[in-house]
Amino acid sequence: MTQPARTGEHDPVMDDLEKEIDEMYVNEANEYVEDDAEPVAEHACAYCGLDDVDCVMKCTACDKWFCNGFGKTTSSHIVTHLVRARHKSVMLHPSSPLGDTVPECYSCGSRNPFLLGFLPAKGDAVVMLLCRSPCNFAANTKDMGWDATQWSPLIENRTFLSWLVKIPSVKQQKKARPITAQQILLLEELWRDNERATLADVENPEHEQTLPETLHHYETAKQYVLIHQKLISAEEDYDKRLKENLTQRDITVNWETSNGKTLVWIRLPQLESGEIRLAMGDELKLIYTGSLAHKWESPITVARFSSVSSTEVACEVPHGHKAPLHCTTNFNLEFIWTGTTYSRMNRALNRFFKSKSCMAPVIRDVLLGKSVDIPLINTQKTLSLSVPGLPELNHSQLSAIKAVLGSPISLIQGPPGTGKTVTSATLIYHLVRLRKTRMLVCAPSNVAVDQLAEKLHRTGLRVLRLVSRTREVMESSVSFLSLHEQASSVEPNSQLGHLIQLKHKNGGLNSSDEAKYRTLLENREYELLNAAEVICTTCSSSADKRLNAFKFPLVLIDEATQATEPECLIPIVQGCQQLVLVGDHQQLGPVVMNRKVARAGLNESLFERLVLLGVKPRRLEVQYRMHPSLSEFPSNMFYDGMLQNGVSSHERLRKHVAIPWPIPTMPMMFYQNLGQEEISPSGTSYLNRTEASSVEKLVTALLKAGVAPEQIGVITPYEGQRNFVINHMQFHGSMVKDAYRAIEVASVDAFQGREKDYIIVTCVRSNNRLGIGFLSDSRRLNVALTRARFGLIVIGNARVLCKDPLWYHFLVHFKDRNLLVEGALSNLRPSMIQFGPPPVPRKSKSRLEQAKTNAAIGTESLAMDPVRAPFRGATGTTQTLREGMWDTLSLDAKTLSQSQSDWLNQVRQDKDADLESLDGYRSQASIAGSYEDEVQPEKNVSSAQGTSSAPSITKFL
């Protein structure tokens, strides 16, 4: 029997089919024939109604049928449904050539179609289905005549291989019911509550949710508050629904007791795939549903992650919740949703509306976008701005501090490696000394707050770190500064000390002692807070009731560009008279889970809005992190060429590191890889096996050269690639496994604000007909390129990436310097790829309209999409070039045919199958990919689809 086409073979039949379908959509006739006389078949596609048994598959999770045709989406209908619904098992039609087969792994039985692939037999007319990992990793060890290197996924280019389930013909698709990507999105949302919902329900206007858009200028405080409250409410509902959908049932646990603590170990395979993300301190609920003990439930807190398995996590059970230690099965796990941050944002908005004294009038006017003259604040001339415990400042840092000291509202822009934290600490020191009042220092993340608190402690200021009650059990580098630790550090023979000892000994207190304990502890905490000069906490925790008794005339918000505007408002309404926002609007912005809310403008930070209103940020201009050659492109592209180097080339070169840099004095290169991207096991992300293999080889070379594992970082935009790279290094790396475990593989988001000696970036995206997704986000690229100190290697497919204007200029930069290479790592040679003229920018929309479009296109989005929109910044040659780049993503649908317009709207609203980010997301979510300028097939990047003439496979192993 003829075998299916192998990966790498060109498939002209598929190309012709796609061409015909494209031509069909460009033709506005787009015929659709609906025969009301014929009843709809039970196995008809739930989207388009196509009912050819050879072209449909059944989703076994919901018992709905879907076809393998694209229609007006960038994925086939069955793949689109699996991604949106997070379903992971399919079945062929009983009348299809393969019968009612459920594809599953021959070795482990996994039925996840995003994980499955096939190996062709050498002598038999059969194929073996194996999951990508771990089963295919071990396939070569079986003496069965199978070659694991020939493994290919069942889904490529977002459609099932045509030898498994046929792709409908052009004629069939013409007769199918037309359905847009937006209709599919709404239909999937309706199915969550009503599995019988139809397209007729989708067309009901009641299901359309209209959200107000944020403005730059507000007429009144009431208008400002109402708009933001509606957006917060929509985001809150979306976030809550995400958490509720994560409930895990019938899980197995293991118990561990030591040092008076009870830990429960839970195995969650979804941790590895990225479908579930947990962080230290996250709250969950564990429920026992079996019959071996009374019904039991308890809140639990994530305490640590396994160093051996990426799927196991240990959670701590609170004292007093006696766990059923003899039970290991029949448990449910719920993800506790807390709306604390949302309620605090709403309270801050209400306070802004009701109390004009909650902040200085000039700050209030600036927030409303009113045109005001910002008055100067009288300051005593300081002979020296030096601060004990901190390094001397450079000219741009000194200039920024001098300007900020005399202004009621200021912005400081800190590009990568420019000493933003040191500058902030110096500024805080002088503000506290000059104003002789306490100061509130905030950031959206605990990591940023800890870093700033540590620097401030060195200056001799009385610093107190306030954390939420749920994080008090977690250790950090500044735990000794925390309020809860200092409050507990009392004389043992004091009344509070006695109660603390009694509580620890007995695991709790009686009601009378508990009341005394709380009163004494609150008094102790008040004394500490009142004595502090600087209180450091997150933006959300600045509304902690323990701070209600205090006013904070001085407020500094670090990483302000990563916080939403209502989040920044929480500390500002605590009586702010002088406000400093520190951040970088050319790096990552706020995380917004609901893409509709993002499009409405909530993903634009307060810092960015003030820049657009004309508030000029004070920019730090000397970078101390990167080798000068590494900083050249980011400086020219993102900072108007203004970044200066505070380190020399000699200080950032290591001659003993055996990486074959194309130019030894320039430790950087773009390593051309042509491997195809694949959808990850979660169905919502991407991976690239060829690039993962290159990552392992490069990491191994660095380790062998003596580079410490902790000084190597691997950055990838995709959670699927992150997990695959980690596993690939463990299975295939030639060094000891512990060395690879210490290598940090993470997202761009996780690396923001951090650095490593050597950074490897794996781009992942490599396809025939799709775009590069949120790789086109300029801020994401900026962060990825600016994490390395001594060396940077970017791995990707230049033929695909160069279709994007931003990446085109990046690749030309490397090509012109002979830094774009290909071949084996031991024999690198300059790449022969030739670039044509840059992609032609198209006419831009208005700034506000562009912002909304970028919110949709600049980030990947499927169903649960954390959105970071690209920034439209200040004027200048470099900025104008960047705006031109973004213009390619903002076609005006009115100038297109209806079919093209539908396609474009689908691109903006639906990006079909991708995403994530990681550590740092404040909510569980995965994301699904994006599609921009179409990439034409290259000879080296061809489809793995079987030809339509290939006989159907009749046997699986």
Q: What annotation goes with each model-predicted range?
A:
Residues V56-K58, N68-G71, S75-H81, F114-F118, ...:
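Intrinsically disordered, low-complexity regions enriched in proline, serine, glycine
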Residues M1-K175:
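Cys/His-rich zinc-coordinating "finger" modules and their low-complexity flanking regions
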Residues I300, H321-P324, L368-E485, A515-L521, ...:
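ASCE P-loop NTPase helicase motor core
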Residues F66-C67, K285, I760:
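Hydrophobic beta-strand signal
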Residues D51, G71-T74, T289-H294, S542-A543, ...:
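Short, charged beta-turn/beta-strand-edge "cap" motif at the junction between a beta-strand
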Residues R6-T7, N136-L215, T220-I227, D250-T252, ...:
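Pre-ATPase regulatory/linker segments immediately N-terminal to the P-loop/RecA-like helicase/translocase core
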Residues L434-T437, S445, S540-V941, G946, ...:
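Conserved helicase motor core of SF1/SF2 NTP-dependent helicases
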